[in-house]
Regions:
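Residue-level recognition of well-ordered beta-strand positions that form the cores
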Residues: 41-43, 87-89, 103-105, 119, ...
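Hydrophobic beta-strand-centered segment that forms part of the acyl-chain substrate-binding groove
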Residues: 67-101, 107
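A generic structural signal for short beta-strands and their flanking turns/coil linkers
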Residues: 24-26, 36-38, 80-86, 98-100, ...
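Non-catalytic linker/capping segments at the edges of enzyme domains
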Residues: 1-47, 151-175
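Residues that recognize and position ribonucleotide moieties
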Residues: 31, 53, 126
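A short mixed-secondary-structure module that forms the rim of ligand-binding clefts
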Residues: 42-68
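Short, flexible micro-motifs
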Residues: 22, 60-61, 72, 107
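HotDog/MaoC-like acyl-thioester-processing domains
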Residues: 1-6, 95-96, 107-175
Length: 175
């Protein structure tokens, strides 16, 4: 299922998941797709391993948490997701030093809370880990202090930004 990228999403400088200047971070790039899916591209490095050749489960959980949480921004750009609950199911080992796609989408959305689901996809399209999560909606000013920290929140264009994602049919929006 080929889905067009609608826009690239912002990143911070110091965030562990998306931080462009975080030497220990994942440097994940996030994209909103035409069907409302939030998609992320990441190549996890060997210093994020658990067992040799495998990404640490906590790193996988962080990727899923951030991607599902960002799915709220598709329908509510000014709302931010604070994790209330996250449940992860590990299906296959996640290798490092290979490009991975992480996807997330909102399932339910009300005034204060939203829930979503996500998956880490291996290069062959198989799901390596899946997650469901519940999030409380917050204003950015209530959860982050960009001004006094010197942090920024902006889009960092990249020559390799994709025009589309080819996702497995199992990720098709369920009606």
């Amino acid at each position: 299922m080929k889905l067009r990228v609608v826009k690239k999403h912002n990143a911070a400088k110091g965030c562990f998941v998306c931080g462009v200047n975080n030497a220990s971070g994942l440097h994940t790039e996030f994209y909103e797709l035409e069907d409302g899916t939030m998609a992320a591209l990441v190549t996890v490095q060997s210093h994020h391993q658990s067992y040799p050749g495998r990404v640490h489960g906590g790193v996988c959980s962080a990727l899923l948490d951030e991607t599902i949480g960002r799915a709220l921004n598709v329908s509510e750009p000014d709302a931010w997701a604070v994790t209330v609950e996250l449940s992860v199911r590990f299906k296959k080992p996640v290798p490092y030093d290979v490009p991975l796609v992480v996807v997330g989408r909102a399932l339910t959305n009300n005034r204060r809370l939203f829930s979503g689901e996500g998956a880490i996809l291996l290069p062959n399209g198989e799901e390596a880990a899946t997650a469901t999560g519940k999030y409380m909606k917050q204003k950015l000013s209530d959860i982050a202090d960009f001004e006094s920290s010197g942090e920024s929140w902006e889009v960092y264009p990249n020559d390799s930004d994709p025009d589309y994602f080819d996702l497995p049919d199992t990720w098709a929006v369920r009606e």
